[in-house]
Amino acid sequence: MIATSLPSPGVIAAAVIGALAIVAALALLIRRRPDAFPLLAVLALPFRLPISTGGRTVNLLIPLYLLIAAGILTRLASRGDSGAADRRRQGRSGERANVSPPWLARLLTPRGLEWLLLGAVVLYGVQALYSADHTKAAENLAFFYIPFGLLFALLRDVQWTRALVLRCLAVAVALAVIFAGIGFIEYYRKSLFLNPKVVAANEYDNYFRVNSLFFDPSIYGRFLALVMIALTTVVLWTRSRRELLIGAGVLAWLMAGMITSFSESSIAALLLGLAVLAAYRWDLLTTVYISGALLAIAAVILLASPASLHFGLKGSGGSANNATSGRTNLVSGGLELFAKRPLEGYGSGSFETEYKRHSDTTAENATSASHTIPVTIAAEQGIPGLAVYLALLLVGFFVLFSGAGRSPPRIALAACFAALVLHTWTYADFLEDPLTWTLLGIGVALARE
C-alpha cells in the first residue's frame, strides 16, 4: 500500500488552502448545475487515498469528502430556496405501509429509514465511549458514518429523472470498464499497483488476485458486481437491439474483470442481484426453481471436484472451514465474544482488539474475523446494535422493494442493495461503505416520487 505520513505544517497549510479552493469551485459548479453533484458523487465513490498517522493507515475518500463539503456549502448558501427540497423530502414521508400496529407502519417508510440510519450513527457514537479501541471508533465516525450520512441527505434531495439516473449509471460503467482494464494489466504483469498485503498473499496462493485501483480484491469485486447488476437491468428492460448488444459486451468485459479478482463473495453477490432482477423481469417461481437447480449443480461440482482445483473440501486439510478460507472458525470466535457480553458488547470499533485479546491470534486473523458484519456488530454493540442493524435491513428492503415493480431504476437499486448486504455477510464494510448510503439515498428519493 502506498502510504504517506503527515507532512510539515507548511505543506498542510498549502493543502488546506488548495482543498478550500477546490470546495469553493465545486460549490459554484453545483450551484449552477445541480445535476453535477450526483454525477460527481458517483465518479468519486471508488477513489481512496492512504493516509498514515498514529501507527496505522486509513484509506480515505478525499475526493468524495471535498465533494460532500461542496454540496453542504451549496445547501447552506441556498437555504432561502430550500422550499422545493423540503416539499420533496416531505412528499411521501407521511405515507404509511398498509400494516399494523401503527408504529410499524410509520417505521416502514422512507422517513423511518432515515431515523434508523441516524439512530445507528448515534448508537455507534455512544458505544464508542466504552470501546477498547477509541481511535478506530473515532475514525469510523469521522471518516465514514458522518460524511456518508451527509452524502445520503444530499442524494435524497436530488431531483432524480430517468436521464440523470442513466447518466450516473454511464459514469459508473465507464469507471468499471477502466478498472477492469487496469486489472487485466495487473494480471498479465503479475504485479499490483496498490496494496503490498495482496502482493504478499499472492506469493503463497496458487492463483493471482488483482485489485485494480482498489486496495482490496473483494472491494474491487463488490464494485464490479453492483455495476453489473445495474447494467443488467438496462439490458433486460431495453427494447433497443443496439443497447442490448453493447450492454452484453460490456457485461462480458466486467465479468472477466471480476474473475481475475477471485472474489467468491462478489460472485455470490452478483448471482443474488441477478436472481432479484430475474424475479421481477419474468416469474418468481421460475426464478426460484432455476436458482435452486443451479445451486444444486454448484454443490455437486464442489463436492466432486478434485483437490487440485483448491476448493478446500478435499485433499489435505479439506473441510468446510478450509473451503471458506478459514471463515467458519473466525466467525465462531466472533460469536464467542458476543456470548460473553451480549447486552452491551465490547464497544464500537473494538472487534479486532478484543478478538486478539480473547483468541490469542494474529492481527491478520483478527482483521479477517471482522469481515462478517452481523458478527462484528453483535460482538461490538451487543443486542442493541444488532437490533438496530436488523431493523435497518428490514426497513431498507421494504422501502426499496415496495412499489419497485414498475420502475427499472428502483428494481436495480433493490437488487444492488440485496447483493451488497450479502457481500457484507462474507466481507467487510456496511455503513462504512459509501455505496450503502448512495443506494439508500437514491432509493429513498425515488420511493417518494
Region annotations inferred by a language model:
Residues M1-I2, L49-S52, A200-L213, N329, ...:
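Juxtamembrane membrane-water interface segments that cap and precede transmembrane helices
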Residues A27-A36, L73-W115, V234-G249, R281-I290, ...:
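Membrane-interface helix-loop-helix junctions at transmembrane boundaries of multi-pass membrane enzymes
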Residues P63-Y65, G112-A120, H134-D157, A176:
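Aromatic-anchored transmembrane helix interface
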Residues F193, S308-H310, G317-S332, E336, ...:
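Long extracytoplasmic/lumenal interhelical loops at the membrane interface
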Residues M1, A21-A27, A69, V121-A128, ...:
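Alpha-helical transmembrane segments of multi-pass inner-membrane proteins
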Residues L64-L73, L274-A275, T286, I290-G292, ...:
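Transmembrane alpha-helices of multi-pass inner-membrane enzymes
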Residues L76-R79, G181-K190, M258-T260, A278-T324, ...:
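A membrane-periplasm/extracellular boundary helix in multi-pass inner-membrane enzymes
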Residues M1-S78, V126-Y130, L420-L422, T436-T438:
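N-terminal signal-anchor transmembrane segment
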